[in-house]
Structure formats: C-alpha cells, structure tokens
C-alpha cells in the first residue's frame, strides 16, 4: 500500500474509476448482446448509443467502436 498521501488518494480514485468504467463497459456489452439475441431497430439504436458513449469516454478505441457498429448494422440487414 502507498505511504504518501497523494499516492493513497490516487489509488482510491483509481479504484472508483475502475468501477465506473467497468460498469459502463458492461452496460455496452449487455446492450450489444440484447441486440444480437433479438435484432431490431430499437435495440440497434440502443446498442449504437452505448457504443458511442463508451467511445466518447475513452473506454474503447474509435476504430473498435466503428467496427462494432458496422457489424451490428450488417446483422440488422
């Protein structure tokens, strides 16, 4: 464990950020899986939106976001 006050604070902040980022990524994956289970326009929009949010927050690379959305669009027909 860190001894310096600023290092302790950063460690605590990193734990909180990790929880927040993990939840956001999990929500994105859940939306994608919901679409894949039952492809519809409404679920496509929800999945696409969650991918865009993850991209804008830096959780996934912009190329991965684009690739994922293209694959979902192809499944939509």
From Swiss-Prot:
Q: Which GO terms describe its molecular function?
A: small ribosomal subunit rRNA binding; structural constituent of ribosome
Keyword Flavoprotein annotated: no
Keywords, comma-separated and alphabetical? Ribonucleoprotein, Ribosomal protein, RNA-binding, rRNA-binding
List where this protein forms a coiled coil: none
> Looking at the keywords, is Ribonucleoprotein present?
yes
Superkingdom is Bacteria
Q: What is the residue range of the signal peptide feature?
A: none
InterPro entries membership? Ribosomal_bS20, Ribosomal_bS20_sf
Q: What does the entry list under GO cellular component?
A: cytosol; small ribosomal subunit
Question: GO:BP terms for this protein?
Answer: translation
Similarity-based family? Belongs to the bacterial ribosomal protein bS20 family.
Which named protein is this?
Small ribosomal subunit protein bS20
Species for this entry: Streptococcus pyogenes serotype M1
- Taxonomic lineage of this organism? Bacteria, Bacillati, Bacillota, Bacilli, Lactobacillales
Gene coding for it: rpsT
């Amino acid at each position: 464990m860190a001894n310096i006050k600023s290092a302790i604070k950063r460690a605590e902040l990193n734990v909180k950020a990790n929880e927040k980022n993990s939840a956001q990524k999990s929500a994105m994956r859940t939306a994608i899986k919901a679409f894949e289970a039952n492809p519809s326009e409404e679920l496509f929009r929800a999945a696409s939106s969650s991918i865009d949010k993850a991209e804008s927050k830096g959780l996934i690379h912009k190329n991965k976001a684009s690739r994922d959305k293209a694959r979902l669009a192809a499944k939509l027909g």
